[in-house]
Amino acid sequence: MNPEATELLLAGAQELGLDVAPVLDQFAALLVLLQEGNARFNLTALKTERDIVLKHFVDSLTCLGGGHLDGNHQVVDLGTGAGFPTLPLALMRAELQFTPVDSTRKKVEFVRATAEALGLQNVRPVAGRAETLTRQPEHRDRYDRVVVRAVAALPILAELALPFLRPGGLLVAQKGPISPEELRAGQRAAGELGGRVTEVEAFTLPVLGDARTLVVVEKLRDTPDRYPRREGVPNQQPLFWSAK
């Protein structure tokens, strides 16, 4: 990691109230592994050290605000891609147990190999789609938290994520700006799925100043058995939402 990227990581984390110095070497190793993997598998569109540090590492750490991940939780990372936010979070929170999920097997294998290379004992990747995995007893109603960095509309995220959670669990969704219409649809969808939106926090990404929104959904009761709908339907026909 070059000196500029190192300073950006330290400064970005400090702005979030976090100290990455104890795991700085592991973050540097993660950056190298990501660049090497990207050359082979095209894992992410971000190529420069600056972009990776700010838009992957620091952005992933923003969900640690608010104490939503404090404690010894079982955490699903829905649509982890190249391992974000799982890998930065796992470096910072050894007490959390992560199950990063992605439908692309090469990405899941990359996350598994990278976690092993970094010596992380708290990462167990799974290949599959949420619609299928949450029909399996080992995944439905089993987790304390779901984290997701997504551009998908909130009703879609709610339908895919809430079935993973046991009652009392939280969906922590890292999104860009969210419209009032999307939020209303997300609130209705959450209610239909056994949850409720408890927090919507607008903030800016450290250093870059990009607009972000953290949405927290609490699961209050079991999700009806009819959800999630079959593969692809939540994305094609989101609950209570028709994007203009």
UniProtKB/Swiss-Prot annotation:
Positions with a binding annotation for S-adenosyl-L-methionine: 79, 84, 102-104, 130-131, 149
Renumbered residue ranges of the record's region Disordered: 225-244
Domain of life: Bacteria
Top class in the EC scheme: transferase
EC number in record: 2.1.1.-
A cellular-component GO term for this protein: cytosol
CDD domains on file: AdoMet_MTases (cd02440)
Keywords: Cytoplasm, Methyltransferase, rRNA processing, S-adenosyl-L-methionine, Transferase
MF terms in GO: rRNA (guanine-N7-)-methyltransferase activity
Keyword NAD assigned: no
Compartment annotation: Cytoplasm
InterPro entries in the cross-refs: rRNA_ssu_MeTfrase_G (IPR003682), SAM-dependent_MTases_sf (IPR029063)
Function: Specifically methylates the N7 position of a guanine in 16S rRNA.
The protein, known as: Ribosomal RNA small subunit methyltransferase G
Gene: rsmG
